[in-house]
Amino acid sequence: YNSGFYQDEEVGDPTYAINEPQNRINGTGTGFFVSQNLVVTNNHVVHLDEEQKNECRNIKGRLGFDEFELEIVSKEYGNDLALLKTEFSNQKIAKIRVRGVRKGEKVFSVGYPLSFTLGEGAKITEGRVSSLSGIRNDSSTFQISADIAGGNSGGPLLDDKGNVIGVSVSGLKQEYSGGGSTINFGIKSLTLAGFLETNRVGLDENLSTRIQNVPDLVEKAEKYTLLIQCYE
């Protein structure tokens, strides 16, 4: 999606089902409900190609035992965001904290990485906000130390109270990071809020104010975080 980012299943981008053509699944990603029938994910998750010119022929969501169709409502190439709608009605929605992130605060990534290998259950990783900007001082993204892998794309990044502070997007290639550990990024919740406002989607302003223990945080996030499958 951007020069210097993995375009395979290693970090951040959809997981590609290269060896399972009978399923006709081109890739998978993660999304989360921002209203009862609207879902946010990355724009590249709902496209068949790296250039994001060809949309998935069909998009399916899976949340627990429920599986449902998804349809693109709006997309923003520059910020790599997409809004999807479904006839399925989900009662739990994400709480989005628009107030800016702080360097050093805890961050949790929830998503469905490498679902063909690791299974379709949601996975969580923990880290810190490493920087308040992305590559080349990109102010719409921020750097995190929490691991994200192929299939995490589009998933929520949470603070220690369970509020969404960003959207998982990608990792930097190792040759750009000096050969050390992979550097990961998220789209800021402020950028997400602007995208939702443009599409007249209201935010749940009743934010969580108490620090949650991690099992509770994960349990709540799993109720609005879904696996997204892109079909050719």
Where are these regions (language model features)?
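Extracellular/periplasmic catalytic domains that process cell-envelope and extracellular macromolecules
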Residues: 25, 33-34, 75-77, 88, ...
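A structural micro-motif recognizing beta-strand termini
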Residues: 21-23, 44, 84-90, 96-98, ...
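A conserved glycine-rich beta-strand in the N-terminal activation segment of trypsin-fold
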Residues: 18-42, 67-69, 154, 179, ...
